[in-house]
Amino acid sequence: MNSEHPMTDRVVYRSLMADNLRWDALQLRDGDIIISAPSKSGLTWTQRLVSLLVFDGPDLPGPLSTVSPWLDQTIRPIEEVVATLDAQQHRRFIKTHTPLDGLVLDDRVSYICVGRDPRDAAVSMLYQSANMNEDRMRILHEAVVPFHERIAPPFAELGHARSPTEEFRDWMEGPNQPPPGIGFTHLKGIGTLANILHQLGTVWVRRHLPNVALFHYADYQADLAGELLRPARVLGIAATRDRARDLAQYATLDAMRSRASEIAPNTTDGIWHSDERFFRRGGSGDWQQFFTEAEHLRYYHRINQLAPPDLLAWAHEGRRGYDPAN
């Protein structure tokens, strides 16, 4: 659930999987990089791009999810995660699904924020849920989080199998903030459409800050080498176009899938039925098979209730739709 934290102006984001107050245990460093995105919006892809720049090549000192942990995730003791980060001598880059209004913005830190067409993110999460070992997730969560601090299951038992179309309708209509105790809302654990656009909105209103930069899944698909140059510039890391082209070959979906045991998140935690299936296809437009004409119309009505036109254009098409530098 989301609520105002009494000690700061941050919003508190707590669910079965994450607690943004875990950030209080970490001392940030000058030059740290925080990568934030809604689920299934290109965060792992961005971590891989940043890793290629930080290490100037494809090799990693360990699994990506250990080198660049999801700090908020409640399946590892925070002391263990912080100790790993404190021991790192390289420039740190840390994963979060927390919106920027749930983080303390530090002028010494770069915030790399990523978007994707919300419909594609929802389809991807639908498939990811089928690949996730929910029992294992719950065991890990309960081993870390005391009983009195645990959040209720992500959604109630509905008594019947739900079709993808039913899931999408709930996802489309759901509120920004789930009721207390629910943890997540549909779709299958992903935030609602309102949640996603809220998160992107927290970036959009801060996009002109010098240490906040926006990236988009569609732009990666269009020109991966060119997009690799953008975080290089933002992070002050020297890279030529030729070097970016060389590095980008290690960040294609096929390349990441071939090294899924290193690149996919949480591979050391046993939460996936298949590490390779985390990198399912990486395409766009699969949502069309689940949307009737009525859903199409409702979707466009709904998004215009939730966000301004410039944000919506960027959220759905990347810089082709609207350049956030404007």
UniProtKB/Swiss-Prot annotation:
Q: Is the keyword Cytoplasm assigned to this protein?
A: no
Which keywords does this Swiss-Prot/TrEMBL entry list? Transferase
Q: Provide the coiled-coil residue spans.
A: none
Q: Which SUPFAM superfamilies match?
A: P-loop containing nucleoside triphosphate hydrolases
Which GO BP terms, alphabetically?
Answer: sulfation; sulfolipid biosynthetic process
Q: Which terms in the GO cellular component ontology are assigned?
A: cytoplasm
Q: Which Enzyme Commission numbers does its entry carry?
A: 2.8.2.-
User: This protein's superkingdom?
Assistant: Bacteria
A Gene Ontology molecular function term of the record: sulfotransferase activity
Q: What Gene3D superfamilies does this protein map onto?
A: P-loop containing nucleotide triphosphate hydrolases
Catalytic residues of the enzyme: 97 (proton acceptor)
Q: Which InterPro entries match?
A: P-loop_NTPase, Sulfotransferase_dom
Q: Which residues bind 3'-phosphoadenylyl sulfate?
A: 40-45, 116-124
* Similarity field: Belongs to the sulfotransferase 1 family.
Function field = Involved in the synthesis of cell wall sulfolipids with activity towards mycobacterial trehalose glycolipids and eukaryotic glycolipids such as glucosylceramide and galactosylceramide (type I and II) but not towards eukaryotic 3'-sulfate galactosylceramide.
Q: What is this protein called?
A: Glycolipid sulfotransferase Rv1373
Supply the source organism for this entry. Answer: Mycobacterium tuberculosis (strain ATCC 25618 / H37Rv)
